[in-house]
Amino acid sequence: MAIGTGDQAPRENYPAWVRNDLERDYYDTEWGVPVTDERGMLERVCLEGFQSGLSWYTVLVKRPAFRELFANFVPDALVKFTNDDVERLLQDERIIRNRLKIQATISNALLTIELRDRAAAGDTSLAGFYLPNGQWVEPGLPAFIW
């Protein structure tokens, strides 16, 4: 499949799941790139949770609204969300509306802060678990997210 827009020459070597410009941009700029900052890691973990049972394209389309409604996945802001916030989010059609996934996002923010506190006390945080130079994955094997 060849994909290209504007001045960009079409590429033939995209994976089969890349079917449109949004997925192409994601593949070219984010796929396989390690996420090393706290906010980015929290966003990725939470969006992967929302994606469960759905396509990643669905999440990509809704990601701007997720960022807006979930305080840009800043953990210190997310942990302040209340039951009223959960109810408000359940009414917003711009995101995937699943009570358990919304509640898990708030819980993940709390756990992120706990990891940060552990790191300040000498423990490692999630950033200590990614491979700094990446890892080559043989063709046909699944890729790592981190």
Predicted regions and their residues:
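HhH-family (HhH-GPD) DNA N-glycosylase catalytic core used in base-excision repair
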Residues: M1-W146
